[in-house]
Amino acid sequence: MDNRFSNIFNLTEDQAIALFKQPLDIEDGTSERYVGAAHLINFPTERSIKALIEAVEDRDPALANRIARRKAVESLGRLKATQALPTLKNCLGDTDPLTVENAVWAIGEIGTEDESLLQAITNLLTQPHQTYRVIIQTLANFNYLPALKKIASFTNHDDKSVASAAISSVARLNDDYSHMPAVAEFLQSDDINVRRACIQDLIDAEYYPAIASMAKAPISVAFRLRGIRLLAAKGLASEKITFATIEPHLDRIIRDRPQDIDLVHEYDQPPSLDFLIRELYHTDFGRCYLAGKTLLEIYPQEAPEALLSTYQEEAHNDYGAHFHVVKLFGLLGYQPSQDLIVEALHNTSPQFQKSRAAAAISLGNLQSQPAIPLLKQTLDTPIFDLKYACLLALEQLGEDCWSEVINDRNLLIKAKAAYKLDPQTA
């Protein structure tokens, strides 16, 4: 789990516990309790775990306390606090569904062989208003076969993210993957949450036939890249797939051209330029990709100025739109954007990380020879997608740097380098 923001306030253990135990009736008590609960994950001590358990056992019905309890439950899971399992088991009967959800997840993180605990989780599948997806995933991760029949009853659930988890879990528990194509089809769902969710289910089932569809799914590059990286790691280790199988799809994700995406949306009439620019700010990346593709097709002459204008006004501070704008400048071949793209390449703010890889690809698309030294310097980065993008861009600029990363610590960069130097190795 990404812990970059876990201790952004630099709290000590004493300070975190003090915040966590603030009375509910003081000013800002709500947020302070929550912050304290969140920050105790930085201190895997008996004292912190005891404080978190005490917080979970405090059943004051006030909203502030309920919110803090949920976070305390989550923190116990992240700390893998086995001594908290009895307390977490009691949470399975809580009237707050979000507390129940967090308790199930936390038990999954901690691990258990307690049959009564696993059965208690299974029984939640018969109760209304529960987060069935998390329950199903947790039971499958425990390989708990007694839950199979109950899980199977959710394979046609109205909530397709639940159905996806159920189909994937049944496949894993039964060792029968004949119905997994249905999960891959969810990559084309109208619901962005279903598209995102099924990526995890394809990973959990180690369903390699979905790699090509995953690479073209209309969701954020971060979801697709995570999916293919985890599947590749498992598949290469088990020798169920080769790097040659993965390479074109991995390259497609890193290049992330909207014309390579299998879109789920369409326009009933040609949209205006202003409308397409606004669509780049949408949280559903499927709509962003459709807008980008349409900009390239209908407004190749007008788009650069419009993109530059929206960048200066708003996109420079919106990490989603920033990513699309940086990428589109390269695809449009807009040479005046080079300084802006170089700035994006060097932007180390975590929320703009995707834009750094997009910037590298754009510099390659712009055939920017002056960028070659900058791209080579950036090869020192530990960030996978940025390094991979720099290597692709350098290759596009006539610079073969694969021999320099043949011993890279990242599995896929090392495999790519070996494949480029000797295709027979894959």
Give each language-model segment a name.
Residues 36, 72, 103, 135, ...:
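Conserved hydrophobic register position within alpha-solenoid helical repeats
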Residues 31-42, 67-75, 102-105, 290-293, ...:
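Non-membrane alpha-helical segments in proteins
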Residues 32-33, 65-69, 100, 132, ...:
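Residue-level detector of extended alpha-helical repeat arrays and alpha-solenoid scaffolds
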Residues 319-361, 373:
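Alpha-helical adaptor scaffolds
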Residues 10-24, 43-60, 81-93, 112-125, ...:
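Amphipathic alpha-helical scaffolding segments comprising HEAT/armadillo-like alpha-solenoid repeats
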Residues 200, 229-230, 274-313, 317, ...:
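Non-catalytic interaction/regulatory modules that flank or connect domains
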Residues 27-29, 60-65, 95-97, 127-131, ...:
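Short inter-helical turns and helix N-cap capping residues of alpha-solenoid HEAT/ARM repeat scaffolds
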